[in-house]
Amino acid sequence: MAQFTGRVVGDYLVGRQIGSGSFSVVWEARHRVDGTEVAIKEIAMDRLNKKLQESLMSEIFILRRINHPNIIRLIDMIKSPGKVHLVLEYCKGGDLSVYVQRHGIVPEATAKHFMQQLAAGLQVLRDNNIIHRDLKPQNLLLSTNENDADLKIADFGFARSLQPRGLAETLCGSPLYMAPEIMQLQKYDAKADLWSVGAILFQLVTGRTPFTGNSQIQLLQNIIRSTELHFPGDCRDLSLDCIDLCQKLLRRNPVERLTFEEFFNHPFLSDRQSYDFSRSRLGLRTMDGFLSSGSSPSRNMEESSQEDCLPFLLDDDSSGPEGSPSYLKKTSSMKSSSGIKVDTRIERKEVESSPLKHTELTSGYSSFNQKVENDRFRFETQINSDRRNRREPTGLTDSRSLIAPGRVDDSQDSMDQDFVLVSGPPVDMPSSSSSSSKPYNFPFKSQSPPVELFNRSISSTAPMPIIGATSNSIGQFGSLDSQYSAPSTSHGSLDLGDAFEQPSTHSLTRIRSLRKYAATIAELVYERIESDKHLEAFSIQLAILAIWKQALHICHTQAISGLEGSPSQDINKLRSSSLKHDTHSSNKVTDLSHDGSEEISSQIQRQFIQEIELAEELAKSIEPGNTKMPDAMETIFEAALDLGKLGGVKEVMGDTENAGNQYSKAVRLLVFLLVEAPMLILNPPLSLTNSVRYRLRTYIDFLSRRLKHLQSHRRSSAGQMQGSSLAMMNRQS
């Protein structure tokens, strides 16, 4: 070891610097008692934004519980003012890229040895719901310099997020191993890792990468133009199994690419030793409300279709994540003290690319954009076991469930995410399976025609009729504003009265709901404006205009036809309640005309005009040449999943207040998609299939139960605190 520098971090003596990045420095170190050599990554937390800090801590929370010989071990985390030190396993052999530079073309037997170890590590990650989105030789470390060294997967999100991405590194590093669907900013899933594995194997046995280019654009063009994988003429001695594996991993269309199960069982890796699943899983303790983390990794198709239930990728760039990104559930595979399970398997032809209509479901997320952000974490509920107990069918019309695809918000974000935490993916289907053609897969295949989650058929754009199931009286509500609370203020204010799949027949109740939907969706617009995603913001803003237009239509229809029998009665109740609860509110209904709707209509008109002005401003910022308008409904759906994911992260981290806020907004968006969106004046109109409705109801039910759990927990905690205070007062007296 290099000369001791005199620095001490925890129980470790710090030696020479062995690496550095924009926000981190890596040091060689030695335990001062037993002499164990380690690598210490020193991260300057004050240089990370809040999202990166959360993603980093979330990833650490997960990775500390993975113990496998083919994954770099996180030994300890040491905090100091302004810094976090990650104590990592030290690998004397350096990384695989150095090995390749030193040896050139490696014997097939050696390549097989490394591939078997890489496969074992990937299987562990997959069983723990982790997608490593930056597999390349530089991120594969070797325990020694020998040909039989242990290979260890490293840099789970930290390196990508913390290191500068200069042009040279961008062109010479990740893109050479990056799946084409990622470079094209399409939806992608764990199969992107398999492309990277194929590129690494190809380089090991041929001495060069499968595709090259003078720029990333040219590299992508070369991949797209290729019709088959070409091996150099001096590689005639490669076995058929090796060639077959390379060809099947490097399929441009991820739908045609091998599934993970097919990869793990490929003849080229057939003599790989199996590992103990129980040891590789996250050692997360079970908490009430969460599925156990030790669930079996193998699931049949029926179970898988149901377990797809909460595709929250804690990936945040989302986003994830994820994380990110990402966490646990007592009733799920991962757990939190509240009840969210994070399933254990990742792959998916599903999460892959999810182009709904014109847009793809996006991250990130990345979930945790960074790691856990990057980690897209999907929370799976107890619904599967509950259904089995009730003997309800577990299969859906289309076996694939809505899997939140790893969102690729922008190229830099997508590159900054190293792995995604997702809830257990559906059982792998052979690459030749016809299942990919099923009509409403949430997971969209990146190379195949877009598969729509929401069926958008062009038809008349006339105002939708005001129909709906019977609802409770609106007398409990004040004015449109007096009882309204911003979506982020309290998770106890969520109104689920419209969750019967049909809008309320009470005009004021429905208008109030529309207003809350618009306010929540408006947050998405401003988030995208801040991220310079003006086209996406404009698309969502048009949906908000449709909401307010529907509200105006309700007012006009009520005034003309008295649809609810006695409209003035509801209006008067509203006015009475408003005067009682908020006599000083500038927004209350103070002067109603004979039909009672004039003032409310005026308020809505003013809001509608404001939204039009914002839409006009957004339209000015859209660059010419943008021919495809993102699908606002898909964007809203993705946002709901991201919010649910973030709520799960907050819940696991013990921040129940914010968890409830995120759950509340997620439910509101999902209820909007289920109840109101199909009724809006959209072109083309939104049409939901029964299977999509079922999924939306499932998500709403799950998140609503999480909300109820948090509220119950808070009431219980408050009661205990009050009891303790009374007991203390009694003792003092």
Swiss-Prot record:
Cell membrane found in the keyword field: no
Top-tier EC class: transferase
Protein name (database record): Serine/threonine-protein kinase ATG1c
Main localisation: cytoplasm
Region (Disordered): 292-363, 379-414, 565-596, 713-733
GO CC term (a single one): cytoplasmic vesicle
Gene transcribed to yield this protein: ATG1C
Comp. bias (Polar residues): 329-339, 566-577, 717-733
Transport among keywords: yes
Location(s), subcellular: Cytoplasmic vesicle, Autophagosome
Keyword list, A-Z: ATP-binding, Autophagy, Cytoplasmic vesicle, Kinase, Nucleotide-binding, Protein transport, Serine/threonine-protein kinase, Transferase, Transport
Disulphide bond pairs: none
Biased composition (Basic and acidic residues): 342-360, 379-393, 579-596
Family matches, as Gene3D superfamilies: Transferase(Phosphotransferase) domain 1
EC number(s) reported in the record: 2.7.11.-
Active site: D134 (proton acceptor)
Classification via Pfam families: MIT_ATG1 (PF24497), Pkinase (PF00069)
Family per record: Belongs to the protein kinase superfamily. Ser/Thr protein kinase family.
Described function: Serine/threonine protein kinase involved in autophagy. The ATG1-ATG13 protein kinase complex regulates downstream events required for autophagosome enclosure and/or vacuolar delivery.
Residue sites binding ATP per the record: I18, G19, S20, G21, S22, F23, S24, V25, V26, K41
SUPFAM superfamilies hit by this protein: Protein kinase-like (PK-like) (SSF56112)
